[in-house]
A protein has these predicted regions:
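Core RecA-like ATPase module of SF1/SF2 helicases and allied nucleic-acid translocases
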Residues: 1-146
């Protein structure tokens, strides 16, 4: 959180539940007046990777189109963008939905999480497996040096 809202953390028990929660949040954001082109979904995985909760997902028409890696178009058109964390490094968006998190402790995971979680200008929403709650709590404590 820099100048924006409090970070939202969302636990899930299955990829299906994660997908449902992500789509529900997108609907809520759209109903609150956030435009599709302000929303970026980040994942360690490509959307065509079975590890992504959006793999083979049918996206309801009220949510609109989700496009992959639309560089140079961050402020145009009316669609939600999907990037891998590595592809989005150095870029920013008003709203970031960070999905498909594998962990919080491993050095590679921590670096990937840092890159993803530092991309939001206003709102960051983080989706992680419920069994990672203890790791997330440790990460939070360590980041505050407690």
């Amino acid at each position: 959180k820099a100048d924006g809202e409090v970070v939202g953390y969302h636990k899930y028990d299955s990829k299906t539940a994660e997908k449902t929660d992500v789509l529900k949040l997108i609907r809520r954001l759209l109903s609150e007046g956030i435009s599709r082109n302000d929303i970026v979904i980040l994942s360690p995985y490509r959307m065509d990777n079975a590890n992504s909760c959006l793999y083979n997902a049918s996206i309801p028409s009220d949510i609109g189109e989700i496009r992959l890696n639309e560089f140079n178009k961050l402020d145009s058109d009316d669609f939600i963008r999907f990037y891998t964390v590595k592809a989005f490094k150095g870029l920013e968006a008003r709203v970031i939905l960070y999905i498909d998190i594998d962990g919080f402790e491993d050095d590679d995971e921590r670096l990937l999480n840092y890159v993803a979680m530092s991309r939001a200008r206003t709102l960051l929403e983080v989706f992680y497996r419920a069994d990672l709650e203890e790791e997330r709590q440790k990460m939070m404590l360590n980041s505050y040096n407690l």
